[in-house]
Amino acid sequence: MGKSCKVVICGQHGVGKTSILEQLLYGNHVVGSDMIETQEDIYIGSVETDRGVREQVRFYDTRGLKDGLELPKHCFCGTDGYVLVYSVDNKDSFKRVEALKKEIDRSKDKKEVTIVVLGNKSDMKDQRRVDHEAAQQWAKAEKILLRNGPTHGSANWNLHPDH
């Protein structure tokens, strides 16, 4: 087993951070199940890198941010990457992701961290409130990867940056 990485998952309250994690790691998220508010959890997964090395990843599933709440300071210490999650049916959740990106840029303790943005619930086309092209342009300007995925459990997020 190679090194261990710390990845912080963050975003506005109710955008599906825990659901995405549970589906990607365990394949067991049930759409429509009752939402339980996360305080903070740590998930540990083993990931094979593009170099064929297995690395342990500690995913820090943070409490959903509501108005006035900032990311806890310990989320910036020793973090290798961030996954910023918004819901495509909630424009405020995308604004929160933009603010989180600025907060990370100001507070990170390393010069190089990986940031990935996930737009959840992309299958809810009739309820979309975040313009896909505008979100992609923002991500391109910020030099970060942005992917959209559906609410249902068969999501293939395609997180490799070369895709």
Curated annotation (Swiss-Prot):
PROSITE patterns: RAB. Gene3D superfamilies: P-loop containing nucleotide triphosphate hydrolases. A motif (Effector region) lies at residues 35-43. It is found in: Cytoplasm. Coiled coil: none annotated. SMART domains: RAB, RAS. InterPro entries: KBRS, P-loop_NTPase, Small_GTP-bd, Small_GTPase. It comes from the Eukaryota. The keyword Nucleotide-binding applies. One of its GO terms (biological process) is Ral protein signal transduction. SUPFAM superfamilies: P-loop containing nucleoside triphosphate hydrolases. Belongs to the small GTPase superfamily. Ras family. KappaB-Ras subfamily. In contrast to other members of the Ras family, the members of the KappaB-Ras subfamily do not contain the conserved Gly and Gln residues in positions 13 and 65, which are replaced by His and Leu residues, respectively, and are therefore similar to the constitutively active forms of oncogenic forms of Ras. This suggests that members of this family are clearly different from other small GTPases proteins. This is NF-kappa-B inhibitor-interacting Ras-like protein 2. It comes from Xenopus laevis (African clawed frog). The gene is nkiras2.
